[in-house]
């Protein structure tokens, strides 16, 4: 391993000069270690990543942690390979940083743990699976109206407090319980408090044993925030490629990945592009997203929380992400106010899998009829608000009558929320979901009260709930 010396420090950007014609490759990791020699100094153990070559002997690097205490002239060792992180079953139930060091309170992983580099090529064409397979989540509104594809990419939109985290936890739980699947969670540039809460909530609900967690939070340098998504993805890829698993990969928040890339780009002196973003925005996003896919041995399905700056969907950051998405799940605050959980907007959420050749004719027809009924109800709400229900035609009254039952039946209790609600969570198989909505739309349950449809799983539970309320089916 060749050693060089630090020649310049500009915040998170560090220049390192090497002798004897040695120049580390782009993406190589460089380690700076220094023992404190006096009380005024601090121990330093810093990892840098090569970003640029400057001339014949100097590299410009991005620091993965704070550069406080680093001085010119300090020794830097080229490790000869990219940053590598632990992979495999040893990562389950644990929390890591961008470098793969555990940041939970348990024992560190031993040196025998297998480690993989975070930079790698996307699977080649001959490795990709050509089958489009639906990933059943057990969540009615998702499975019926915006189904997820195995190996697909799903965008999760929602403001603060509308249930993104609970939806993520339920997906992790359902995949673990029903499919025996594994999840990897990457916290990219979000609040440390939220990561802490998520960890303890997952511990309480028992989901943590099937999950690996990686965090590079808001307070960390841009290098860590930019690379932590790749750290999580590398762990997920190992479960897919080596263990043949169907993996769920969560990124919260993909916008912060772009934001960190923009900061790094500016620090490296690149000319900014549209709205001040990095000129390499599309390339960086593509390199990450192309690795998330189904292969012949397994799949990585990603669910990405997306922050939309100033609600501007034409902003280059979210717009670049949209190009890669197969489905969107939009969470709507108005639905939480009505007590409908999960608060997924059935009209705004989309999926390219909702096509008759993928989901089947019956599923497609029922889903479209549900959307048409809800859309008509939405159009009638203004008339109802001004004139009242009595002014509607008999046909429109029937639409409203059924739409409200459909809307309430799209809600259900979650397993991970049992400790808060006291209600047992429900996993609803896709066949049962389609059957339930088909019967509601046919008018079979028009005589049952609306509240019987609220927060239940299968259609049989509606009948039981109505009986408890004194109404016979």
Curated annotation (Swiss-Prot):
Keyword ATP-binding listed: yes
Major subcellular site: membrane
EC number: 7.1.2.2
Reactions performed catalytically: ATP + H2O + 4 H(+)(in) = ADP + phosphate + 5 H(+)(out)
Keyword set includes Ion transport: yes
Membrane association type: Peripheral membrane protein
SUPFAM superfamilies: C-terminal domain of alpha and beta subunits of F1 ATP synthase, N-terminal domain of alpha and beta subunits of F1 ATP synthase, P-loop containing nucleoside triphosphate hydrolases
Entry's localization field: Cell membrane
Family annotation (InterPro entries): AAA+_ATPase, ATP-synt_VA_C, ATP_synth_F1_bsu, ATPase_a/bsu_AS, ATPase_alpha/beta_chains, ATPase_F1/V1/A1_a/bsu_N, ATPase_F1/V1/A1_a/bsu_N_sf, ATPase_F1/V1/A1_a/bsu_nucl-bd
PROSITE patterns documented for this protein: ATPASE_ALPHA_BETA
MF-aspect GO terms: ATP binding; ATP hydrolysis activity; proton-transporting ATP synthase activity, rotational mechanism
SMART domains: AAA (SM00382)
Signal peptide coordinates: none
GO CC, one annotated term: proton-transporting ATP synthase complex
Protein residues bound to ATP: 158-165
Short name of one Pfam family: ATP-synt_ab_N
Name of the top EC class for this enzyme: translocase
Transmembrane parts of this sequence: none
Alphabetized UniProt keyword annotations: ATP synthesis, ATP-binding, Cell membrane, CF(1), Hydrogen ion transport, Ion transport, Membrane, Nucleotide-binding, Translocase, Transport
Protein family per UniProt: Belongs to the ATPase alpha/beta chains family.
Function: Produces ATP from ADP in the presence of a proton gradient across the membrane. The catalytic sites are hosted primarily by the beta subunits.
PANTHER family: ATP SYNTHASE, ATP SYNTHASE SUBUNIT BETA, MITOCHONDRIAL
Subunit text: F-type ATPases have 2 components, CF(1) - the catalytic core - and CF(0) - the membrane proton channel. CF(1) has five subunits: alpha(3), beta(3), gamma(1), delta(1), epsilon(1). CF(0) has three main subunits: a(1), b(2) and c(9-12). The alpha and beta chains form an alternating ring which encloses part of the gamma chain. CF(1) is attached to CF(0) by a central stalk formed by the gamma and epsilon chains, while a peripheral stalk is formed by the delta and b chains.
Protein name, as recorded: ATP synthase subunit beta
Higher taxonomy: Bacteria, Bacillati, Bacillota, Bacilli, Bacillales
Gene giving rise to this polypeptide: atpD
């Amino acid at each position: 391993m060749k050693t060089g010396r630090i020649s310049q420090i500009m915040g998170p950007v560090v220049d390192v000069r090497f002798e004897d014609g040695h120049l580390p490759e782009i993406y190589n990791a460089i380690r700076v270690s220094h023992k404190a020699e006096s009380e005024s100094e601090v121990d330093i153990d810093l990892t840098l990543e090569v970003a640029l070559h400057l001339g014949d002997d100097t590299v410009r690097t991005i620091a993965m942690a704070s550069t406080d205490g680093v001085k010119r002239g300090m020794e830097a060792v080229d490790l000869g390979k990219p940053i590598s992180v632990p992979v495999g079953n040893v990562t389950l139930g644990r929390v890591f940083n961008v470098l793969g060091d555990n940041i939970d309170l348990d024992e560190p992983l031993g040196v025998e743990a297998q480690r993989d580099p975070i930079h790698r090529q996307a699977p080649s064409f001959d490795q990709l699976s050509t089958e489009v397979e639906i990933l059943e989540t057990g969540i009615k509104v998702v499975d019926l109206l915006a189904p997820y594809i195995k190996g697909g990419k799903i965008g999760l939109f929602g403001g603060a407090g509308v249930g993104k985290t609970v939806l993520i936890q339920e997906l992790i739980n359902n995949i673990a319980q029903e499919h025996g699947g594994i999840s990897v969670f990457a916290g990219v540039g979000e609040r440390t408090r939220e990561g802490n809460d998520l960890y303890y909530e997952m511990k309480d609900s028992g989901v943590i044993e099937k999950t690996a967690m990686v965090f590079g939070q808001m307070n960390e340098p841009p290098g860590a925030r930019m690379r932590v998504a790749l750290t999580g993805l590398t762990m997920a890829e190992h479960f897919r490629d080596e263990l043949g698993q169907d993996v769920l990969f969560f990124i919260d928040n993909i916008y912060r990945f772009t934001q960190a890339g923009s900061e790094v780009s500016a620090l490296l002196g690149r000319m900014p592009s549209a709205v001040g973003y990095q000129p390499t925005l599309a390339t960086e996003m593509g390199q990450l997203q192309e690795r998330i896919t189904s292969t012949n041995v397994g799949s990585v399905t990603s669910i990405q929380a997306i922050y939309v700056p100033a609600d501007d969907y034409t902003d280059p950051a979210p717009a670049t992400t949209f190009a890669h998405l197969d489905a969107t799940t939009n969470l709507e605050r108005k639905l939480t106010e009505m007590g409908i959980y999960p608060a997924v907007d059935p009209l705004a959420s989309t999926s390219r899998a909702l096509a008759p050749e993928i989901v089947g004719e019956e599923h497609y027809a029922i889903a479209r009829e549900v959307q048409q009924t809800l859309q008509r109800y939405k159009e009638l709400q203004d008339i109802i608000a001004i004139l009242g229900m009595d002014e509607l035609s008999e046909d429109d009254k029937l639409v409203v009558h059924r739409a409200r039952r459909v809307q309430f039946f799209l809600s259900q209790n979650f397993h991970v929320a049992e400790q808060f609600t006291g209600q047992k969570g429900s996993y609803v198989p896709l066949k049962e979901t389609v059957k339930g909505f088909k019967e509601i739309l046919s008018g079979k349950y028009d005589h049952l009260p609306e509240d019987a449809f609220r927060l239940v799983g299968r259609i049989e539970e509606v009948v039981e709930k109505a009986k408890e309320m004194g109404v016979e089916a």
